[in-house]
């Protein structure tokens, strides 16, 4: 009977240890995914700001060109 109790205790203990290891790995994977998502959103924000800045510059150049053309006539 004592042998069965020890065996059962050992099985339960090893099960708990493996569950805690799996939970830890799962949390690490979720953290990595969240970090990748943050990096991607930062890249998108940077890309959007660059596109916006390029559009502003192009608009100013086009407006200047139109003003120059209107001034020549």
From Swiss-Prot:
Tissue expression as described in the entry: Expressed by the skin glands.
Disulfide bridges in this chain: none
Acidic residues composition-biased segments: 30-40
Keyword terms: Amphibian defense peptide, Antibiotic, Antimicrobial, Cleavage on pair of basic residues, Fungicide, Immunity, Innate immunity, Membrane, Secreted, Signal, Target cell membrane, Target membrane
Propeptide positions: 23-45
Record region (Disordered): 25-47
Keyword Signal: yes
GO biological process, one term: defense response to fungus
Assigned protein family: Belongs to the frog skin active peptide (FSAP) family. Dermaseptin subfamily.
Designated name of the protein: Dermaseptin-S13
Organism: Phyllomedusa sauvagei
């Amino acid at each position: 009977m004592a042998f069965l109790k020890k065996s059962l205790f050992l099985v339960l203990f090893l099960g708990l240890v493996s569950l805690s290891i799996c939970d830890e790995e799962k949390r690490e994977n979720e953290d990595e995914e969240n970090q990748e998502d943050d990096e991607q959103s930062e890249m998108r924000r940077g890309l959007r700001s660059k596109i916006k800045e390029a559009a502003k510059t192009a608009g100013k150049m086009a407006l200047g060109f139109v003003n120059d053309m209107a001034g020549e006539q």
